[in-house]
């Protein structure tokens, strides 16, 4: 801080006040620069996350379309008659076994 007791004239006081004012202005300018940089980083990160979420939305939309078509075909096959019920049960068993095999293999690769 300024040393007011050593100031001998009004010119010295003005010089001290001017130096302190410049120091505080420089400090404020550096803080503003840091805040601006932080705001720009947040903006960039937000835009990246929005792009990522838009991509996920389109992925989920396409997966929903695929699953809807599969469910319709599966339902049509189930309603088509008794002969297909054996096939339907066989497919269900194969899918369940495949699920357990894949989960086992994935658990082994992670450990």
Curated annotation (Swiss-Prot):
What sequence ranges are listed for the domain t-SNARE coiled-coil homology? 15-77
Query: InterPro entries attached here?
Result: BET1_SNARE, T_SNARE_dom
Classification via CDD domains: SNARE_Bet1
Q: Which residues lie on this side of the membrane: Lumenal?
A: 108-111
Mode of membrane association: Single-pass type IV membrane protein
> At which residues is Phosphoserine found?
9, 37
Recorded protein name is: BET1-like protein
Native organism: Mus musculus (Mouse)
């Amino acid at each position: 801080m300024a040393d007011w007791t050593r100031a001998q004239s009004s010119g010295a006081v003005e010089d001290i006040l001017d130096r302190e004012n410049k120091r505080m202005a420089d400090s404020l300018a550096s803080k503003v620069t840091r805040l601006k940089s932080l705001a720009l980083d947040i903006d960039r990160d937000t835009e990246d996350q929005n792009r990522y979420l838009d991509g996920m939305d389109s992925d989920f939309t396409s997966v929903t379309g695929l699953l809807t078509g599969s469910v319709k075909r599966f339902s049509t096959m189930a309603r088509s008659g008794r002969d297909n019920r054996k096939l339907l049960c066989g497919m269900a068993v194969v899918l369940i076994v495949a699920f357990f095999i894949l989960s086992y293999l994935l658990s082994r690769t992670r450990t």
